[in-house]
Amino acid sequence: MQAGESAALLVLTKQGLNDLIKENKVAPGSNADFASSGMGVVVKHGAPKPDISTPEAYKQTLLKAKSIAYSNPASGGASGVFFAKTLEKMGIAAEIAPKTHHPPPSGNSANLVVSGEAELAIQQEPEVMEVSGVDIVGPPPGDLNNITTYSAGVPADSKEPNGAKALIKFLQTPEAAAVYKARGLKPV
């Protein structure tokens, strides 16, 4: 869209779609949220699951971990950027920095747990679900979790607006919701 390409339907993060709405690139009233995902904390399969039930327990778990993997914030990945800010907010960024490991660009932090390079990994739950050899401990507690909402909308210049609207309607059905749940997304 930014480069002048056209599309019949847009599926983006809610923020990304809202930015296009402000630029009048989305047909008014055509947008709808359909799923969301949060971050997941993972350990190697069979390892004891640390306590992450409260902000303080989560903080202590991070401080006690020998090594932690998360997406490199410099690459712009939402979970890595959010987690780096969370470490600063919790006042432990300096303590965590020496034991931080980042996967290669487009890599998955959970793979570093499987390989033994990291004891814990934090990344979007649907992404870590795809890696065998890890167990999901759960989401970070409360506002220490980054919830991403996914939205769909019809481009203002769509040549197939009726088809796009039908697909958006389908994205909100129980059938679609079952697929989201199986992939670690939550229907909204």
Predicted regions and their residues:
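Exported/periplasmic ABC-transporter solute-binding proteins
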Residues: 2-8, 13-37, 43-188
